[in-house]
């Protein structure tokens, strides 16, 4: 593993679940079904360790607002108890390619949003996933938030390298 590799947070282990080695995870990944697929490698980062612990996903299921994961070789509550409070991460090399028009959250967060007319709206501070399409929360220069739906009629161009998003606001969108 490269020492200088960038790591991306995909979840936080907040507790154990049951006695068979499952952990409760608050997910921070864009694609939980993909990221937590059986056989995938994840890395556990604990404050007390100098190196991450590599684990292999044995099972994944959703329970209430949590993702429940179990790992190969960690079969009891005693095995996973030390992981409480730890972060689950993946190296940048594991992110994989996306289809055209798809972006990882970290590519969109902190992008500057500008209208086609050149008016700067603000920076994307978070992404909501309420249903049919994502909604980008943009912090305006006056401190208020604008909600920008990620749909073709509004988002004209995304340039993650330059951290610029060009939009065509619908009537009333920015009021």
UniProtKB/Swiss-Prot annotation:
GO cellular component, one term: cytoplasm
GO molecular function, one term: ribosome binding
Domain PRC barrel: 100-173
Record's keyword annotation contains rRNA processing: yes
Subcellular location: Cytoplasm
Keywords: Chaperone, Cytoplasm, Ribosome biogenesis, rRNA processing
Superkingdom in the source lineage: Bacteria
Signal sequence bounds: none
Assembly and oligomerization: Binds ribosomal protein uS19.
Matches recorded under NCBIfam families: 16S_RimM
Function: An accessory protein needed during the final step in the assembly of 30S ribosomal subunit, possibly for assembly of the head region. Essential for efficient processing of 16S rRNA. May be needed both before and after RbfA during the maturation of 16S rRNA. It has affinity for free ribosomal 30S subunits but not for 70S ribosomes.
Family: Belongs to the RimM family.
Entry text on domains: The PRC barrel domain binds ribosomal protein uS19.
Name assigned to this protein: Ribosome maturation factor RimM
Protein's organism: Geobacillus thermodenitrificans (strain NG80-2)
């Amino acid at each position: 593993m490269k020492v200088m590799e960038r790591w991306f947070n995909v979840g936080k282990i907040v507790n154990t679940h049951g006695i068979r080695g499952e952990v409760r995870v608050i997910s921070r990944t864009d694609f939980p079904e993909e990221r937590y697929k059986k056989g995938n490698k994840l890395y556990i980062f604990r404050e007390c360790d100098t190196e991450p612990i590599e684990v292999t996903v044995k099972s994944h299921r959703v329970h209430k607002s949590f993702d429940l994961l179990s790992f190969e070789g960690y079969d009891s509550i005693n095995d996973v108890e030390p992981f409480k409070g730890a972060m689950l991460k993946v190296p940048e090399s594991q992110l994989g390619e996306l289809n055209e028009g798809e972006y990882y959250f970290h590519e969109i967060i902190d992008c500057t949003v500008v209208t086609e007319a050149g008016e700067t709206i603000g920076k994307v501070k978070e992404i909501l996933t309420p249903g049919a399409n994502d909604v980008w929360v943009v912090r305006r220069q006056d401190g208020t938030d604008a909600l920008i739906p990620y749909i073709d009629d509004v988002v004209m161009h995304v340039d993650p390298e330059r951290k610029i998003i060009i939009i065509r606001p619908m009537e009333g969108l920015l009021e």
